[in-house]
C-alpha cells in the first residue's frame, strides 16, 4: 500500500529484510514520486465545481510481499482544463533513518501528488487490477474536497504516522470520502464484521506461506478483537466494495485487469493440520537423531546440523518478537503468547548445534536438554491457558507447529542424557 523513492539495490535488500521482520507488511506501488511543475487550479479555488471529477482508485494486490494487500488513491480531475492529480497516502522514502524508525514502530508516511498517466503505466506494468469509482457528490462538495486534498498535500500538512490496520493508504481516503459524504460511508460500514483482522491478513498472505506464518507469529491477541466493516477498510478492496454499496459512487469501472493473478481467498486458510505434520516431522527427526547419536559415530554431527537449522529458523523470529515487545512501539506485537512457544532461548540451540558438529560432550547435551525441556514446559503452558476466558489469541496453528518440536526434542535429549556410554565432560 505504499509508493517509494528509488533506492540502491543494497538498500532495497535491507528494506525488504526490515519489512519481512515487521509485524505486518505494507503494500508497495514500487514507484518514485516526481514533483509536479505547477499547483493544480483547484488548490487556489480556480476550478469550478461543475468541471471537477473526484474518484477513488483501487489497485489490486501485487505479487511481491510489499504489495499483497493492494493500494488506494484519490483522483481529482478538472475536465475543462484537462488537469489531473493522483493523491496517494502511501508515500515514503527508504533511508537508514527510515529503517530505524520502522524497526521502532514509528514510520512516517506522507500524502503525495502524481500524474495520472504515469501512475497508470506503473501499475499496469505490474499486471495489477485498476478500478475507478467516480464519487457522486454535488459540485460544491467536489470543489471543497479537491481543495482539501490540495491543502493536505502541502509539505506542512502531508505527513502522518503509518499504522497498517488503523491509519494507512486505504483508511485515509476512506476518512476523506466519509467527511465529504456527510457520514454516509461510515453509516454503511457500521455493521459487525464476520472476520477478525487476523483472518484478513491470513487471506491476503496465503499466496506466500512463509510470510503468512511469520506475520501470524508476530501478531498478538489485539487482532482478535471484534471489529466492524469500517475497520476492515484497511483493505483497499473492502473500501471499494462498500463505497459501491453506499450510493456515494458510480459503478466501478475496471481500466486494467489483473494479469494471471489468483483471486484472494474468501475465507482464511486452515493451516493447523499441515503445520502439525511439519512440527511432528521436525521433532520426530530430532528424536530419531538423538536415538542414533547413542551408538552411530556420525549421528551427533547430523543432530548438530538439525539443532543449528531449528535454532535459526525458529529462534530468529522469536528474538525479533521479543525485541519488538521490549523495545518498540509495535503494539500489535505486545504480550504475544507465541513467546511461550518460540523465543530467544530457541536461538541458543544454533550455537549448541555447532558445538555438536565438532564434539559430543555431556555439557552440551545437558544444555540442550535443559533448553528443550524449558520450551516443552512453556509450550504445554501455552496450550493449557487456552481454557482461560481472558485468553483470546488465535495461535492454534503455531501451537500445532511448535509444541511437537519442543516436546519431542526434549524427550530425545532427556533419553540421550541417560546414556551411560556418552563421553565427558
Residue ranges and their predicted role:
Residues 2-16:
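Bacterial N-terminal signal peptides that target proteins for export
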Residues 15-25:
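Bacterial N-terminal signal peptides
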Residues 29-33:
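Boundary at the C-terminal end of the N-terminal hydrophobic targeting segment
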Residues 34-54:
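A eukaryotic "domain-start" boundary segment
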Residues 50-128:
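Glycine-rich catalytic cores of cysteine/serine-nucleophile enzymes that process amide/ester linkages
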Residues 62-63, 127-136, 155-164:
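Second-shell loop/turn segments in exported
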Residues 137-150:
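A structural motif
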Residues 151-425:
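Activation targets extended, charge/polar-rich intrinsically disordered C-terminal tails
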Amino acid at each position: 500500500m505504499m509508493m517509494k523513492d528509488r533506492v540502491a539495490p543494497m538498500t532495497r535488500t535491507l528494506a525488504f529484510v526490515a519489512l519481512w521482520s515487521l509485524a505486518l507488511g505494507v503494500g508497495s506501488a514500487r514507484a518514485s514520486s516526481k514533483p509536479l511543475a505547477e499547483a493544480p487550479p483547484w488548490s487556489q479555488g480556480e476550478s469550478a465545481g461543475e468541471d471537477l471529477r473526484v474518484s477513488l482508485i483501487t489497485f489490486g494486490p501485487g505479487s511481491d510481499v510489499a504489495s499483497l494487500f493492494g493500494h488506494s488513491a484519490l483522483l481529482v480531475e478538472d475536465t475543462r482544463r484537462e488537469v489531473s492529480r493522483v493523491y496517494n497516502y502511501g508515500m515514503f522514502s527508504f533511508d537508514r533513518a527510515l529503517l530505524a524508525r520502522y524497526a521502532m514502530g514509528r514510520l512516517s508516511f506522507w500524502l503525495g501528488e502524481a500524474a495520472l498517466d504515469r501512475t497508470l503505466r506503473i501499475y499496469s506494468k505490474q499486471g495489477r487490477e485498476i478500478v475507478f469509482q467516480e464519487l457522486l457528490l454535488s459540485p460544491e462538495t467536489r470543489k471543497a474536497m479537491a481543495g482539501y486534498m490540495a491543502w493536505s498535500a502541502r509539505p506542512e500538512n502531508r505527513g502522518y504516522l503509518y499504522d497498517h490496520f488503523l491509519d494507512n493508504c486505504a483508511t485515509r481516503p476512506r476518512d476523506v470520502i466519509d467527511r465529504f459524504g456527510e457520514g454516509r460511508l461510515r453509516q454503511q460500514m457500521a455493521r459487525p464484521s464476520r472476520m477478525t483482522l487476523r483472518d484478513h491478513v491470513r487471506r491476503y498472505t496465503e499466496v506466500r506461506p512463509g510470510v503468512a506464518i511469520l506475520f501470524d507469529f508476530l501478531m498478538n491477541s489485539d487482532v482478535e478483537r471484534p471489529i466492524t466493516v469500517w475497520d476492515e477498510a484497511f483493505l483497499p478492496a473492502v473500501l471499494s466494495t462498500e463505497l459501491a454499496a453506499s450510493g456515494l459512487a458510480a459503478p466501478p469501472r475496471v481500466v486494467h485487469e489483473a494479469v494471471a493473478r489468483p483471486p484472494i481467498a474468501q475465507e482464511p486458510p486452515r493451516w493447523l493440520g499441515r503445520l502439525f505434520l511439519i512440527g511432528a516431522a521436525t521433532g520426530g527427526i530430532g528424536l530419531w537423531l538423538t536415538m542414533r547419536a547413542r551408538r552411530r559415530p556420525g549421528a551427533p554431527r547430523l543432530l548438530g546440523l538439525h539443532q543449528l537449522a531449528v535454532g535459526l529458523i525458529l529462534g530468529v523470529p522469536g528474538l525479533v518478537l521479543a525485541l519488538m515487545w521490549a523495545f518498540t512501539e509495535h503494539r500489535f506485537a505486545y504480550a504475544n503468547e507465541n513467546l511461550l512457544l518460540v523465543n530467544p532461548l530457541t536461538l541458543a540451540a544454533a550455537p549448541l548445534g555447532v558445538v555438536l558438529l565438532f564434539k559430543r560432550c555431556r555439557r552440551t547435551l545437558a544444555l540442550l536438554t535443559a533448553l528443550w525441556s524449558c520450551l516443552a514446559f512453556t509450550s504445554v503452558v501455552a496450550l493449557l491457558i487456552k481454557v482461560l476466558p481472558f485468553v483470546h489469541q488465535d495461535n492454534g496453528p503455531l501451537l500445532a507447529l511448535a509444541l511437537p518440536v519442543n516436546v519431542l526434542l526434549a524427550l530425545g535429549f532427556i533419553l540421550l542424557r541417560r546414556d551411560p556410554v556418552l563421553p565427558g565432560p
